[in-house]
Curated annotation (Swiss-Prot):
PANTHER family: ENTEROBACTIN EXPORTER ENTS, INTEGRAL MEMBRANE EFFLUX PROTEIN-RELATED
Highest taxon in the source lineage: Bacteria
MF-aspect GO terms: enterobactin transmembrane transporter activity
Protein name (database record): Enterobactin exporter EntS
Amino acid sequence: MNKQSWLLNLSLLKTHPAFRAVFLARFISIVSLGLLGVAVPVQIQMMTHSTWQVGLSVTLTGGAMFVGLMVGGVLADRYERKKVILLARGTCGIGFIGLCLNALLPEPSLLAIYLLGLWDGFFASLGVTALLAATPALVGRENLMQAGALTMLTVRLGSVISPMIGGLLLATGGVAWNYGLAAAGTFITLLPLLSLPALPPPPQPREHPLKSLLAGFRFLLASPLVGGIALLGGLLTMASAVRVLYPALADNWQMSAAEIGFLYAAIPLGAAIGALTSGKLAHSARPGLLMLLSTLGSFLAIGLFGLMPMWILGVVCLALFGWLSAVSSLLQYTMLQTQTPEAMLGRINGLWTAQNVTGDAIGAALLGGLGAMMTPVASASASGFGLLIIGVLLLLVLVELRRFRQTPPQVTASDS
C-alpha cells in the first residue's frame, strides 16, 4: 500500500502477532459485552416494569467502571500488565456466569443483577486500562495511529453485530442464553491473550496507591499538552450524548420507526469511515491543530443537526460528526500515548477513559435539562453551538497543543 494512501493500512495485523491476538480478543469481548448490554435492561424491565430501575443499573455499572478505571490505572503502572489483563477478564467472566445462573432461577434476584453489574463494570474497566497502557509496547509508538484506527473499527463493527445477535437470542432462548454466551466469549478471549509476551511496568518507586493516583492527576493538570487533549476528549464525548434527543427529534421530523434507526446508525457509520480513511493522519506535521479543528467541526455539525429541515440532512450532519470525531479521537489517542511517560501510561489512560465515561453522563444530563426548558431542536443546537464557543476559546488558550509539531513516522517496507 502506498504510504500516501488515505485508506487504513491493515499490515499491523500481519506483522505484529501480539497485536493480532489483542485485536481478536477485543472483538470477541465487544460482542460478548453487547450481548450483556441487551440482556440486562430487558431482564430488569421484565422483572420490575420500571424504567427507573433500568436506569439505576446503568448508573451503578457506570460508577463501578469509573472506579475500575482509576484502580486499573494504578495497577497497570505497578504490576505486570499481562497478568492484570488476564485477571480482569477471567474475573469478569465469573460475574457473567453468576448472571446466567441467576437468570435460570424460578425467581431471579434483582439485587444479584445490581451487585453483579457492579462486579463486571469494575473488572471490565480494570482490564481496559491495562490493555491501553500495554499497547505502545506491543506495536511500537510509531504504529499507534494505525493500531488506534484498527481498534476503533473493531469496536464499531462489534457494536453493530452484538445487539442484533443479542436480540435474536432474546427472542429465541431468553436472557440466560445471552449471559451464558457472554461468559463463554469472555473466557475464549483468554486464549489469544495468553500468547502475549510479558508486559512488565517500568521500574519506579513504591508509593501509596492514592498518592500514585494523585501523581497522575498532577501530571495531567501540569501538562498543557496532555491536559488539553484530555479536556477536548471530554467535550467531544459530551457532544455525542445528543442521541438522547433522537426520539423527540424524530417526532419533530415525523420519522417512521424504521427511519429512526438511521439516526442511531449515522455516527457509528461516520466514525467507521473516519477510521478507514485515516491512512494519512499519522503523517500530519501538526496533529494538535488538526485535532482542535476537527473537534470544532464536529461541534458545528451537532449545532446544525437539529436545524435541518429534513431528517435525511440531519443524518448527514450526524455522519459528519462521526467522521470528524473519529479523526479527533484517533489523534487524541496517539498523542496521549506518545507524549505520556511510560511510567504514567496506566494512570493517564485510566483518567482519559474515565473522562469519556463521565463526559457522556454529564452531556446526557445537560441535554435532559435543556430538553425540559427548550424544544428538542433548540436543545440540540444550543449544545452544539455552546460547545463550539468553548472549542474556539480552547483553540486560543491551548497554545502548546495548537503549535505542537511532530516528525512524521518513517514508513518501512512492511507498511507499503
